[in-house]
Swiss-Prot record:
Name recorded for this polypeptide: Probable fucosyltransferase 4
Organism name: Arabidopsis thaliana
GO biological process, one term: response to salt stress
Distribution of this protein across tissues and organs: Expressed in roots, stems, leaves, flowers, siliques and seedlings.
Enzyme class per UniProt: transferase
Transmembrane intervals: 21-41
Regions annotated as coiled coil: none
Function: May be involved in cell wall biosynthesis. May act as a fucosyltransferase.
């Protein structure tokens, strides 16, 4: 349309002065009106959005602070998910945080504000890290002690270990600082008001980051084995190795005797890829405190995850848009999370068979009707069910979609199948991939029921955030669907996949770790430990 407004130089020259002035006034007026219209549109949209938020905030039964779990000291617009997650959930969580946990979190926030990055206390605490002298037992480093979390492995692992390390910080009055070299800062809002949990990039010990492993000279497990650490002389920092390949010596860090020594070290560096919370209950001192924090023992990650993890606005926009477009209008929502632990990922028929077998046996999805049965009108007003599938492979959702679109089912339900993405392979540390992964974890947590793959940290995060007790798909063996295909968990807690084999005290060394305390038992579907309320 630009050519309409083109006027040749000759025509311009031929116009009178008054005409030129008139044209200038007209165009100027149009320009001003356009700017005003755009401004009005933006203001209108902002007011409309604010009105929507206010309406949500006034919705009866919706507790924006989640029983005091969250503080009100944040600006809502800077992180929309923080206070508005509850408005998307199918119903308020029946699991309420204890008053003791709420009080502990408020105290922690004050401590983090005093000791966090940029404070005088932080600057003082980092002075001693430039040289590797040993500390004397009498030496004090002030009130601030720290635990640094290093980002490792996939997003599910990272969120589980972040919650684990934060709980350890709560129990030991340490400040948690988060490795800022990866994309955590691009995915999650700051959880503590008036400060930051992101480790400054100039932190002295980060120049050794690639060297933190079992062979590192300040690795606690290695120092134990070499008898090179004692209660009178200890280094200014220790590295805690809590990965899937941890040794027994590495796994002793949580024990009471070891903690009395570790407690004197001002800086701890944590590398972990497992949810080690269950082992903290083996320490009698920790156990007393944990019981007060979490009277309902299976709510640890449910509460800590909702306190710590608030997707940034860009991620939250993905969640809310997809939820409203595809899931919000359904009478019921079913989540199916599929992870194949093989070098060659992709679609496997025996996995598809297992998913169908589990969902139909457990009455989560209806069986298909025969030709005769399909002629029977089951219901005048059929119920609608949205099935949300998350997988690296899109074939699973396509097979389910075809299955229910081509034939009638026994209940007459309207089954709609959705899959937000199918990226074929995991792309950890790629910002867009991790944003999608986080969004899909939250979408799964918004479902009414969930079926999840055994051993999948992605699934652990989703159903624990949502307060859901999942149906866990057993690991297939020899390319065959297991029978039974799945088991209903009696706990919503994640599984600690590489736990210690025994408790802390010598009299417990002959006792299997799943029998040391009654509420820390073996996971239903795979070797590991998890927390249970039901005895």
């Amino acid at each position: 349309m630009y050519h309409i407004f083109q006027i040749s130089g000759e025509v311009i020259k031929g116009l009178g002065l008054k005409t030129k002035i008139l044209i200038t006034i007209v165009f100027s007026t149009l320009l001003i009106l356009s700017v005003m219209l755009l401004s009005f549109s933006n203001n209108f949209n902002n007011k409309l959005f604010a009105a929507t938020i206010n309406d949500e905030s006034e919705t009866p039964g919706r507790d924006r602070l989640i029983g005091g779990l969250l503080t009100a000291d944040f600006d809502e617009g800077s992180c929309l998910s923080r206070y508005h997650k509850t408005f998307l959930y199918r119903k308020p969580s029946p699991y309420k945080p204890s008053e003791y946990l709420v009080s502990k979190l408020r105290s922690y926030e004050m401590l983090h504000k005093r000791c966090g990055p940029g404070t005088k206390a932080y600057k003082e605490a980092t002075k001693h890290l430039s040289h590797d002298e040993n500390y004397n037992a009498s030496k004090s480093d002030g009130e601030c002690r720290y635990v640094v979390w290093l980002a490792d492995y996939g997003l599910g692992n990272r969120l589980l270990t972040l919650a684990s390390v934060f709980l350890y910080a709560l129990l030991t009055d340490r400040i948690i600082l988060v490795d800022n070299r990866k994309d955590i800062g691009d995915l999650l809002c700051e959880p503590f008001p008036g400060t930051s949990w992101l480790l400054p990039l100039d932190f002295p010990l980060m120049k050794y980051a690639d060297g933190y492993h079992k062979g590192y000279s300040r690795c606690y497990g290695t120092m134990l084995e070499n008898h090179s650490i004692n209660s009178t002389s200890f280094p200014p920092h220790l590295y805690m190795h809590n990965l899937h390949d941890s040794r027994d010596s590495d796994k002793m860090f949580f024990c009471q005797k070891d903690q009395s020594l570790i407690d004197k070290v001002p800086w701890l560096i944590f590398r972990a890829n497992v949810y080690f919370v269950p082992s903290l209950w083996f320490n009698p001192t920790f156990q007393t405190e944990l019981t007060k924090l979490f009277p309902q023992k299976e709510t640890v990650f449910h509460h800590l995850g909702r306190y710590l993890f608030h997707p940034k606005n860009q991620v939250w926009d993905i969640v809310t848009k997809y939820y409203h477009d595809h899931l919000s209008k359904a009478d019921e929502r079913l989540g199916i999370q599929i992870r194949v632990f093989r070098d060659q990922g992709g679609y496997y028929q025996h996995v598809m068979d297992q998913v169908i077998s589990c969902t139909q046996r457990e009455k989560l999805l209806p069986e298909l009707a025969t030709q005769e049965e399909s002629k029977v009108n089951i219901s005048n007003i059929p119920k609608s069910k949205a099935v949300l599938v998350t997988s690296l492979s899109p074939e699973y959702s396509k097979k389910l979609e075809n299955m229910f679109s081509e034939r009638a089912n026994m209940t007459g339900e309207i089954i709609k199948v959705y899959q937000p993405s199918g990226e074929r392979y995991q792309q950890t540390d790629k910002k867009v991939h991790d944003q999608k992964a986080l969004a899909e974890m939250y979408l799964l947590s918004l479902t009414d029921n969930i079926v999840a793959s055994s051993r999948s940290t992605f699934g652990y995060v989703a159903y624990s955030l949502g307060g859901l007790k999942p149906w866990l798909l057993y690991l297939p063996n020899d390319n065959k669907a297991p029978d039974p295909p799945c088991v209903r968990s009696t706990s919503m807690e994640p599984c600690f996949l590489t736990p210690p084999t025994h408790g802390c005290e010598p009299d417990a060394w002959g006792t299997e770790s799943g029998k040391v305390v009654p509420f820390v038992r073996y996971c239903e579907d795979i070797w590991g430990l998890k927390l249970f309320d039901e005895l």
